[in-house]
Amino acid sequence: MNQQASGNVPASQAVDGVVVGAGFAGLYMLHRLRSMGCSAIVLESADDVGGTWYWNRYPGARCDIMTVDYSYSWDPELEAEWQWSEKYATQPEILRYLQHVADKHDLRRDIRFSTRVESAIWDEETSRWQVRTSAGEISCRYFI
């Protein structure tokens, strides 16, 4: 896997958006912010993408809705190239899917793995969020 080094957040980084978590929603939000021309990073406490599908690794873990409905629909090429092996995919397959999406869209370069949010404070004077993490501070317009 092609992951960012743990805690790779410069001390006074400023971006348009900070997203907490690299699960389904966090990966989509990073993709969406980039497509709008925004600079963004994702802060993820784990050492890889996946969110729930990274953390919940127990026998029999699987999706409880049809997997095709669980897939991203914003990339027709991705929809065409990824074939689910089961109607209700298992945790390992869903995690592989999210890893594939992160790699295909080069999302990992803007994800800070093994990084926890310690606080987020709105600064009235600058109209920005001041986010303190386990690896440093970040200033952003949007905290998601």
Where are these regions (language model features)?
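Short alpha-helix immediately C-terminal to the canonical SAM-binding loop
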Residues: 50
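Feature captures the FAD/FMN-dependent oxidoreductase FAD-binding
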Residues: 84-143
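Extreme N-terminal leader/targeting segments of oxidoreductases
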Residues: 1-17, 35-36, 64, 96, ...
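Glycine-rich active-site loop/strand segments that organize a redox cofactor
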Residues: 39, 54-97
